[in-house]
Amino acid sequence: MMRYYIYVQYWKRFLRLVRSFHWATSNVLLFKSDFGDTFKMRDYNLYEMLSARNGSGGTYFHEACQANSIALLWRAAGMLDESHPRILNIRDYKGAQCTHIIATSNVSCSIDMMNIVLQLGADINGQEGLAGLTPLHICVNKKNYALAEWLCQAPGIDVKVENFGKETPYDLACKMEDRKMMKIFEERSKKM
């Protein structure tokens, strides 16, 4: 039932966006956003749709990641012509970015979803606001081995980022006595 509700909400937003594009393409206006960027009106409407917050503080990308929907992420990626790290790195009211939501869900499509949001400008080493966990820390906690292995090979990953408790992902794996996760980090350090 919840997925149906989310699906309906996305279509409502999409239809509002389509209606606004007609007006925006006939009246191209330049203006400054809150972040100091200059947008055309049609870009601003898309930006507004993707960055609008729901009741839990999440954006379009948070909702798409919570729904484990690659289709919704691809749809947004198709509308964007450049990376938008400001939207993708917004934290919800629990302090989570969309990368943290993906790392929390231990589904088969999590690698593909992470790849999409990273291409759109998400921070691979971003720390969530409560405990300072990176997506890699969360993978260790959730025993998401496939995503942890993929993240360890991703460009720009920093496996030595410490959470607020001064623990790296490897430290967490040792603390949890998770040999499989420790092996992933040890193999990565051999390649470096």
Swiss-Prot record:
PROSITE patterns: ANK_REP_REGION. Transmembrane segments: none annotated. The keyword tRNA processing does not apply. One of its GO terms (biological process) is symbiont-mediated suppression of host NF-kappaB cascade. It comes from the Viruses. Signal peptide: none annotated. ANK repeats lie at residues 94-126, 131-161, 165-192. The keyword Repeat applies. Keywords: ANK repeat, Host-virus interaction, Inhibition of host NF-kappa-B by virus, Repeat. Belongs to the polydnaviridae I-Kappa-B-like protein family. Suppresses the host immune response through NF-kappa-B inactivation. Possesses ankyrin repeat domains required for NF-kappa-B binding but lacks the regulatory regions required for dissociation from NF-kappa-B and degradation. Therefore, prevents host NF-kappa-B release and subsequent activation. This is I-Kappa-B like protein H1. It comes from Microplitis demolitor bracovirus (isolate Webb).
